[in-house]
Amino acid sequence: MDVIQNLFMGFSIALTAQNLLLAFIGSLLGTLIGVLPGIGPAAGCAMLIPLTFQMGPTGAIILLTSLFYGTQYGGTITSVLMNVPGEAASAITCLDGYAMAKQGRAGVALSIAAIGSFIGGTFATIALVFAAGPLTRWALEFGPVEFFALIMLGISMLTGLAGKSVIKALMMGVFGLALAMIGIDPIRGSPRFTFDRVELMDGIGFVPVIMGLFGLAEILENAEQPFAQMVLARMSTLIPTRQDIRDSVGPILRGSFIGTALGLVPGITNSASSFLAYVAEKKASKHPELFGTGMIAGVAGPETANNAHANGALIPLFTLGIPSSPTIAVIMGAFMMHGLIPGPLLFKEHAEVAWGVIASFYVGNVILLILNLPLIGIWVKILKIPYGILCGVIMAFMILGAYSVSSSAFDVAVMLLFGVVGYLLRKFDFPLAPIVLTLILGPLMERSLRQSLEISQGSFGIFFSSPIATVLLALAVLFLIAPAFKFFRKGKVVISGDGEAA
């Protein structure tokens, strides 16, 4: 009964004229960002944060979250029509989506993708609604010891699953923590690593850092390759047949579950959800050999999982205060800039914000379903603009966004610096996600650590006095060492195959 009452309260907030407009704008901009190569949801959210300073927290988060899941559908449009994924998660859709487009069924593919995205997002939102109560009640029992262990688990999961090299991921995590230490010591009030620069007294702003790492670096990398004019597939009807709908029901249901479940796990990207959904459909199909030739299930499953993952990834943020991806970390940073800490206390102390934003997920998914299909022609025209011009426009907005955070040229310099740093890190295959996660979670982790040590008078034994903290820390260690065991097992197999091992 409490859930129903809270949802009614949430919808009364989400359906106000201002919040409806913000959800519409976020969905529209999110789709545009998803369509355009060279800028992802993390940089897109970071660019919009300065615009939210004059808004209330509910409207600000509605704008950012609607942009986030709007990008998921935007990447589908170019995947189907041009065989070019606007987002990494839509790459798998190219296989059957573009094949359908060449058969003159691009409209059907996009319609099924839109319907699947709507159902997947709604499924994940329902999961959030019913998970919020139990998870927040459990997390309300946490003290600083348990919160430190929980943050360590979130960081270790993202680090342990972030790419091929755990060592590189750990290095990036430490780098992010070092950045988080810059500024005034929250306990003693003394400056740390500021080098007598007034601009560093408040620390390194995460908005220019993220815009540089995920926006400018992406543009620099894309600028190396000339963008040829893509051949646009022709589109006929948008209305799927009854057989198309029947063939999509199973993939949409499976994709909803896969995307929501994997969205809960920090470090698992929506690309992984889309790929696993595609694999699941091939295994479930009576004709797996036809995948890649225009199977509707190859579009419905991955696209549903993609959007379900985007909404499912918000569950650990809202209930536990743990971001599961760089974009979610940016949204968490926006919460903090508005004086709110996402997690169990959000539902207790700011229920109107929590439930208003959750209700807006339903609204945003409906807006995306209604909005995107009629606007496909506009998105295609935007894609015909030369990439050099698009780059210039995007970079101008980035510079303006970085400057508007604190009206400081220093923030612009930080963005440009981290754009170059991000570009170089990409070249050497260093993951960027751990930097963002530790930069935002670093201050929270430090505060929990120091509060715990003050309670125990400097004894680290306090972290093993709590059963919950002990389990969480053990899981954190497991996620960090698991890749090393995997590497060892591979090495053992190679030696045995040589015939020289005993």
Where are these regions (language model features)?
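Flexible loop linkers connecting adjacent transmembrane helices
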Residues: 47, 81-108, 134, 143, ...
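Membrane-embedded alpha-helical modules
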Residues: 111-227, 337-491
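Transmembrane alpha-helix interface/packing and boundary motifs in multi-pass membrane proteins
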Residues: 27-41, 71-83, 158-163, 257-266, ...
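Helix-loop-helix hairpins and the membrane-proximal interhelical loops
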Residues: 1-60, 191-295, 380, 397-403, ...
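Membrane-interface alpha-helices at helix entry/exit sites of multi-pass transporters
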Residues: 58-62, 99-116, 286-298, 326-329, ...
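A structural-propensity feature for long, helix-poor, extended segments
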Residues: 68-80, 86, 295-320, 324, ...
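Re-entrant/interfacial helical elements at transmembrane boundaries that shape
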Residues: 41-51, 64, 79-99, 130, ...
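Short helix-coil transition sites and intra-membrane helix breaks within transmembrane domains
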Residues: 33-42, 80-91, 123-127, 262-271, ...
